[in-house]
Every structure is written in structure tokens, then in C-alpha cells.
A protein has these predicted regions:
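Regulatory and interdomain segments flanking nucleotide-handling catalytic cores
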Residues: 1-274
């Protein structure tokens, strides 16, 4: 027979449980994670596009997609990750932590922090091995020091979660993708022009400056740099199975422009409910 803990029960009932909030069930949920003070964290990394940082964000997104119950779609750009969750595949489908806001935010932020720091060190070590093989220590000395500091300091993420109507999910992703494109243009501009030269310039102005003065066409940049990266489940051919395929999470570095292909996102949330 369990011993009644009157003090513990009172603390939970009167105080701890009173602060708990829950999102609405059977309605899409967005979890958005942001790197804390990443402007400082990435200050001495390569610009406009650091491969180690970019690969780390992609792997962190994939880790979250694989390990957060109900996640259907992930999207990352810059230092942020957006996840789309549903809990209505079937009538009996459970929600992640019952859609408790405190649990979802604290644990997703912890997961992102753990994954990011693990992958960043992994990719830094692989880069260090490559530099060692080609004896490029002098050429990469400053960059190696920047990577060392990043590993020593470590990264942190914050997280927020919220319900969103099914028809608004794609609009949320359009918003973040448009932000990705704007950030990419501005970063490319900052790498080629002074702050004074860019003052008051729109993204279209910056693209024109890059083309006319530097012979750089923004449209020629890698798709994932311009639009971000996605993660979702896909059927993969498999020769060792009778059915001939298996379902795996994949990282898509060539996503469409969401505003021109809404179905690309909507198919993950418009599920026939049971």
C-alpha cells in the first residue's frame, strides 16, 4: 500500500500542477527551436555558408524528427528548426507528453542542445582529420581555433510550441522559408559589401549589387542555402525485403518554394482522421 505523502501532494496540487498548460489535442502543433546567442557562437565561422554548422543543423533536425513522437515534418534554416507534429493518425494515437507545454519545450530544447553539440564536435573532428591529411594547418589555423572555441563553449537552444490550424501549417513554413531567403541574401551581401554600402538596401537591391558589381548571381547559390532544408519520411528501395522498400527519414536539400508547392507541406498534416 502506497504511503500518502500529504506534503508532496499539497505542493503539486497547490503550486506545481497549477502552472501546467496543455495544447489542444487532434490539432497540428508547431515546435520551433532557436539557437541561443548564435550570433556570437557563429561569429568566427565561415561566411556566408559554414558546412560544419549547416551539416550540424541538418543532423540535429533529423535527430529531433526521429525521436519526437508524432513529428511528421522538419524544416531548418539559419539557427532555427521548425517541427510539425500531429496526433490524429488514428483515434487512439497519443500526443507527445500529452501535449504538455512545459514538458514539450524543456525536453525538445534539451534534445536539440545535446544533438547539436554532439554532431558539431563529430563534424569538427572529421574536418580536423582532413586538414591533418593534407597538412593545411597554417591555412586553416584561425578557423580551427574558432571551431575549438565553439566546441568548448557549446551551444544552447530555446523552444516554443503552439497549436496551429491545419490550413495555416503551410503558411507558417512559407513564413520561415521566406525568412531563410532574406537571411541568405543579406548574408551574401554582408560578405561582399560594407555596412555603409548596404544601408537602406532591400533584398532586391542587394541582389542587383551582387550581380552588377561582383558578378555573383544569388540564384546560382545552392538550393538549401537559399530555401533551407527539410526532413520527412520517404519510401526507400530495399533489396533485402519482400515488399521491396522501407520507410526512412531523409534530409531534403532541394525543397521547392513552399508558396508555389503547398502540397509539399500540406500532405503531412491533411491525414484522414479515424
Amino acid at each position: 500500500m502506497a504511503v500518502k505523502d500529504s506534503l508532496g501532494d499539497r505542493m503539486k496540487e497547490y503550486y506545481e500542477d497549477r502552472a501546467k498548460t496543455y495544447l489542444t489535442r487532434r490539432t497540428p502543433v508547431i515546435i520551433r527551436l532557436d539557437g541561443k546567442a548564435f550570433h556570437s557562437f557563429t561569429k568566427h565561422l565561415k561566411k556566408p555558408h559554414d558546412k560544419i554548422f549547416h551539416d550540424t543543423m541538418n543532423s540535429t533536425m533529423e535527430y529531433l524528427c526521429k525521436n519526437i513522437q508524432g513529428c511528421k515534418f522538419g524544416y531548418t534554416q539559419s539557427d532555427e528548426i521548425t517541427l510539425v507534429l500531429v496526433d490524429y493518425d488514428k483515434l487512439e494515437t497519443d500526443a507527445w507528453f500529452g501535449y504538455g507545454v512545459q514538458k514539450m519545450c524543456s525536453i525538445s530544447a534539451s534534445m536539440a542542445t545535446l544533438a547539436f553539440n554532439t554532431y558539431f564536435k563529430k563534424y569538427r573532428d572529421e574536418f580536423l582529420d582532413a586538414v591533418s591529411a593534407f597538412q593545411d594547418f597554417d591555412l586553416e589555423a584561425d578557423y580551427l581555433e574558432a571551431l575549438r572555441k565553439c566546441v568548448d563553449v557549446g551551444a544552447l537552444f530555446d523552444s516554443r510550441c503552439f497549436n496551429i490550424p491545419t490550413e495555416e501549417v503551410v503558411n507558417c513554413l512559407i513564413w520561415r522559408q521566406q525568412d531563410a531567403t532574406r537571411n541568405a541574401i543579406q548574408m551574401l551581401g554582408q560578405c561582399n559589401f560594407s555596412h555603409r554600402e548596404l544601408h537602406g538596401m532591400s533584398c532586391n537591391d542587394i541582389q542587383d549589387m551582387l550581380m552588377l558589381q561582383k558578378d555573383i548571381n544569388f540564384n546560382d547559390m545552392p538550393t538549401d542555402y537559399k530555401r533551407g532544408t527539410c526532413c520527412y519520411k520517404k519510401e526507400i528501395p530495399c533489396s533485402d525485403r519482400l515488399v521491396g522498400y522501407k520507410t526512412e527519414w531523409v534530409i531534403d536539400k532541394d525543397p521547392p518554394i513552399f508558396s508555389k508547392d503547398r502540397e509539399f507541406v500540406e500532405k503531412w498534416v491533411y491525414i484522414k482522421e479515424c
